[in-house]
Amino acid sequence: MVLAQLGGSISRALAQMSNATVIDEKVLGECLNEISRALLQSDVQFKMVRDMQTNIRKIVNLETLAAGTNKRRIIQQAVFTELCNMLDPGKPAFTTKKGKPSVVMFVGLQGSGKTTTCTKYAYYHQRKGFKPSLVCADTFRAGAFDQLKQNATKAKIPFYGSYMESDPVKIAVEGLERFRKENSDLIIIDTSGRHKQEAALFEEMRQVAEATKPDLVIFVMDGSIGQAAFDQAQAFKQSASVGAVIITKLDGHAKGGGALSAVAATKSPVIFIGTGEHIDEFEIFDVKPFVSRLLGMGDLSGLMDKIQDVMPADQQPELLAKLAEGTFTLRLLYEQFQNLLKMGPIGQVFSMLPGFSSELMPKGHEKEGQAKIKRYMTIMDSMTAAELDSTNPKLMTESRIIRIARGSGRQIRDVTDMLEEYKRLAKMWSKMKGLKMPKNGKMSDLSQNLNIQQMTKALPPQVLKQMGGMGGLQALMKQMGGKDMSKMLGGMGLGGD
């Protein structure tokens, strides 16, 4: 996950506070100082950090709290709220709608990853059912059209550009006319970047915008610049009518928190963040779920969106029926592994689970987790239909395990490890037996049939402990809003929207 170091530091500060025998001014002060230190190291402006401390102390007045009040929970809620306020510009961004043609213009400085981000943005919307297209109006940088052409071809997205024409306005207009005729409902225009903010860049952007009349202008910014993002975002907002911001390169830089908070201070909504070079390393940015993940509380609403993307609607009733029966077979595990691999980077997916520490899977270790899943799937490929569909653990005799190991080319230990993992997941799945199913068979309507006891029962003990027990889960539901939390639990097959 992005900002793993920052999230880990804040989570540790809250955990140390929670472990204290008595919560007094000294313990609160130490907790807030640790959180402030972590934010300053992430290049968040000093004034923002100081204001956050002041606001938390106003909310958490230990002297006026009634006896028996859960001080730990109030402090955690205050930290969550203030972090959200720090990253929330308080202004919604324009949203594209399927079937209704939208023109989106990308602007930014050279080297910010603008051209790559155009393709990621198009690919994201393509997976959501849009018909995107790309227009390269960047005639300043040599190789810009080649790069866009290569990226678009790989993602199977229609594109337009010219090696001969030097007028970006003419290219933009021609591309727009062409894709409107082809009924594209999302036309993305990539414009020229420069090494610095200069009059020529802003004038060219103004001309392209005047000719194409975009519904949205997106400013792409390098997240590694930290709090310097404030001046950059402000300048582009004033000169190019920027309606939204995408921050790139948040996967490997410690200053990402500074960039996010600085952009929010300009009242410009951040709509996506880039978390790597690959086309699927691109996340929608929503403040509450982002802070929830940062604090190790997960983002199961985001996970539910990913599940909905990869699981056809006609498969959902069958999955829900198995959930109600408490039936979890190896075949079902195999199918869920297939879905998991389609969801994108595994570290990004796991960071959406409550209790997952982003430091447990640094970026370099994601491939190991992915390889393990593929290894388990190879083992299951060597099983018979009876073995895959059985719920009887005694069926897996020693002779069967030896045969499966030989057939898959794996060690016996690998097979037993996979079976242990299956048993653990099956036990968790069985706890949802008897859950009342929605009449329409949709996972999205399951949340209204859940109660707090079922949620508590289904979550693994270590995850529940990380969330602060039943009280912590209730507090999290309150923080996220009941509906949002129900959506979040949907991502685990426990509910959703």
From Swiss-Prot:
Catalysed reactions, semicolon-separated: GTP + H2O = GDP + phosphate + H(+)
Principal subcellular localisation of the protein: cytoplasm
SUPFAM superfamilies: Domain of the SRP/SRP receptor G-proteins, P-loop containing nucleoside triphosphate hydrolases, Signal peptide-binding domain
Enzyme class, first EC level, given as a word: hydrolase
Chain spans, region M-domain: 296-497
Cross-referenced Gene3D superfamilies: P-loop containing nucleotide triphosphate hydrolases, Signal recognition particle SRP54, nucleotide-binding domain, Signal recognition particle, SRP54 subunit, M-domain
EC numbers on record: 3.6.5.4
Entry-linked NCBIfam families: SRP54_euk
Record note on quaternary structure: Component of a signal recognition particle (SRP) complex that consists of a 7SL RNA molecule of 300 nucleotides and six protein subunits: SRP72, SRP68, SRP54, SRP19, SRP14 and SRP9.
Domain text: The NG domain, also named G domain, is a special guanosine triphosphatase (GTPase) domain, which binds GTP and forms a guanosine 5'-triphosphate (GTP)-dependent complex with a homologous NG domain in the SRP receptor subunit SRPRA. The two NG domains undergo cooperative rearrangements upon their assembly, which culminate in the reciprocal activation of the GTPase activity of one another. SRP receptor compaction upon binding with cargo-loaded SRP and GTPase rearrangement drive SRP-mediated cotranslational protein translocation into the ER. The M domain binds the 7SL RNA in presence of SRP19 and binds the signal sequence of presecretory proteins.
UniProt protein name: Signal recognition particle subunit SRP54 1
Name of encoding gene: SRP54-1
